[in-house]
Amino acid sequence: MTTPLTAKDFASDQEVRWCPGCGDYAILKAVHKTLADLGVSKEKTVFVSGIGCSSRFPYYMSTYGFHTIHGRAPAIATGVKLANPELDVWVITGDGDGLSIGGNHTLHVLRRNVDLKIILFNNEIYGLTKGQYSPTSRQGTKSPSTPMGSIDPPVNA
């Protein structure tokens, strides 16, 4: 009989490098706990991410991981799942990575109904670039890229 895994078993030994107070910490801890509660196998779990603050996620998991290029996590994750259908494949993305740069890939992976889990971190800004507005930024958001306020209405994610 094997000992059930705990949330701590899913945490890697990598230093978490998000900004103090960032909500990404809470998401990471919730995923650690959820995987343990579900009895998921570390050896059959893969996290695929693109670029952005959220995309550091695979480094912080004691599972398999793939840190790919901006917006392409859904495409890579699809390939992982098709080649290894027994794996539990997760896409980790942010509002900029998943809804702007990779919006087309996100749309098509949803349309194809690939057996993936997608966690989209929506902070309404490109955090890694320190404040560029994103597809989910509220209209009027002032940022380095929109000093007069964004004119675009947000995508409802």
Identify the residue ranges that each predicted region occupies.
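Active-site diphosphate/adenylate-binding microenvironment
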Residues: 4, 8-69
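Generic structural "secondary-structure junction" signal
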Residues: 12, 20-21, 59-63, 68-71, ...
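Flexible, glycine/proline-enriched loop segments at strand-loop-helix junctions
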Residues: 17-21, 92-96, 142-153
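Catalytic-loop motifs flanking and including active-site residues across diverse enzymes
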Residues: 23, 27, 72-76, 156-157
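Hydrophobic alpha-helical segments
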Residues: 34-37, 64, 85, 108-109, ...
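Thiamine diphosphate
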Residues: 53-127
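Phosphate/pyrophosphate-binding betaalpha-module
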Residues: 105, 111-157
